Every structure is written in structure tokens, then in C-alpha cells.
């Protein structure tokens, strides 16, 4: 290590062999702040080299410095976790409910992509560009639950896409009502989540619990932290969620009625200026909202990798006869909407609190 170089924080990944787990591996393999030293998965995978334990289906090969790492059980007392300070969780919700508290009790900071604890009143549900102050709930969580670690969550993928675009609108004009129709990529369900015969030549107008997550999480994210609790935002929100035959990239049609009234050009201006973390030099951070002027953008294949997959791409901002405005938003669902969201939360936390 060269003189003046900061020592990296050792991190681990739970659920490392799955779709989101693989994205975590990609993002952390050569990270300037974090050193990936522990990969945990099921008992079936434990003991195998990572390259043998997972069916890798990302757009780039398994990182050279990771592929021969040995997968370990999801056990916070395992020796590989001894020096790990931060753990990223890509576990399914039921397993997250069981294992994440065990890691918190061992003093680990859990940055979780799982839904298990998102709506607990003492658990921060965070998009750092939107509500970084909610991280103050960590101290309340520690006191209430009696552990030295903490669970910090990021929202559902489709929620992130919508809320990042709604935040600058709410701050300037207020929100009265929001309607969202989603067209969500199959990668959001995992590699085996949607059978090919079900999605090819088809659209599935139902994703279990997705609409409820969007509606409840949005109000918490855009709520106000007061006296140690989050007061939910006060506007009406409705979502209708669909699975479509796209590999990566959630697209959303968003309709917004504001309290003050707003024109499309005004919405475009506040979105374009929205860049609250630009001075922090966070490695994973990108400009949150990128505006496209073309009449047929954004599109998943063309726009999902904007900002290395961390930017929300917005287009077709126009007047609406029922609401005030409507627009189309696109995110890379497994990067900005999942692993990238957790990593950005961790980067922000380290920058501000460590």
C-alpha cells in the first residue's frame, strides 16, 4: 500500500451467486473504498470456488480476482467474516428476515436489497439523493434492538426509478397525486424467475407485491424524519406493474399532479438541476437524472447503461389533461435499482459517518 493510501474497508456479500449477488460482485471487485473478502451463499454452494458455485450470466466475465474465491456459508460467526465491517445482502426476503439480524448482532453494517425490513419504523429505507438524513434512524435501531451493527435498506427497484424523479418535483411544486405504470424487465425476477414460454410474445400484468411496495415505500422515502420517526409523505399514489420481455431495464410511465401546478419545461428544469451528491466524489455515483429530448427515448436497450447503470433516464416530459405532467423514466433495475443502490448507500454512509 502506497504512502497516504487509505486502507480499504473489508466487505462481504450474502446471496452472492444470484442475479443481484453477481451485480454486487461486479461492482465491488475493484472498488476504491471496499475490498471484497467474503462471498456467502447456500449450503449447496458453500465450499466451492465462486466460478463453480454460480451460473454466471452477466455481460462481462467473473472478475479474475474473485472467480477462485471459496464460497462460505451464511454464518456471521464464520472466520471469513471476522474482519468484515460491511455486508451487502442480496438474500431473498424470507432468508434476509432470518440472517440479517444475526449479522447485525455481530456488529456488522448490513446494506440490504431485501424487502424484509424496509418498512420497519427503526430501519432506514434510503436513497441518498432523496433522504440521506433517514440514516439517523440507525442509532434508534441500535438502542431498540440492542445490537452494535445495523440494517440499512434500499427500496424496491421500481420504487427507486420513480422516487428519484419525483423528489425534485416535490421539493419545488409539492405532490398531490401520482400514478405509475411499469414495464419491468425479467432480470428483476432472477434467472429462473419467469419461464421463457410465459414471457416471449407476451406481457404479464402482475408482479406479486410490487404495486404495494411502490405505494408504501415511496411515501416513506419522501417522508420527513421528525422526533426519531418518519412521517409519511402526504400525497396519493397508485401503481400498476407489468413484466415485459426485456432482459434489463425497467421503464415507467409516470403521471404527476402537483400542489402548485407545473409546466413540462419547469419539470424538465428541476429534474436536470437535481444533483445533490455531486461534490462528495462517491465512486458509484452518477448524475441521478439524465434528460433525453428525442421523441422515442428512453429505451431499455439504448439507455439502461447511462451513468454506468446508475442514472435514471427521463424523456417525453409533456402536459397531461388529467394530471399536470407525464413522462417516461428508465433505470437499470439490477444496478441502480438493486446492487448499485446498496453500494451507493454504503459509500455515502462511510463518507459521512466513518
From Swiss-Prot:
Substrate binds at residues 184, 210, 243. Pfam families: Semialdhyde_dh, Semialdhyde_dhC. The keyword DNA-binding does not apply. One of its GO terms (molecular function) is NADP binding. Pathway: Amino-acid biosynthesis; L-lysine biosynthesis via DAP pathway; (S)-tetrahydrodipicolinate from L-aspartate: step 2/4; Amino-acid biosynthesis; L-methionine biosynthesis via de novo pathway; L-homoserine from L-aspartate: step 2/3; Amino-acid biosynthesis; L-threonine biosynthesis; L-threonine from L-aspartate: step 2/5. NADP(+) binds at residues 17-20, 42-45, 187-188, 333-334. NCBIfam families: asd_EA, PRK08664.1. Catalyzes the NADPH-dependent formation of L-aspartate-semialdehyde (L-ASA) by the reductive dephosphorylation of L-aspartyl-4-phosphate. To a lesser extent, is able to use NAD instead of NADP. Belongs to the aspartate-semialdehyde dehydrogenase family. This is Aspartate-semialdehyde dehydrogenase. It comes from Methanocaldococcus jannaschii (strain ATCC 43067 / DSM 2661 / JAL-1 / JCM 10045 / NBRC 100440). The gene is asd.
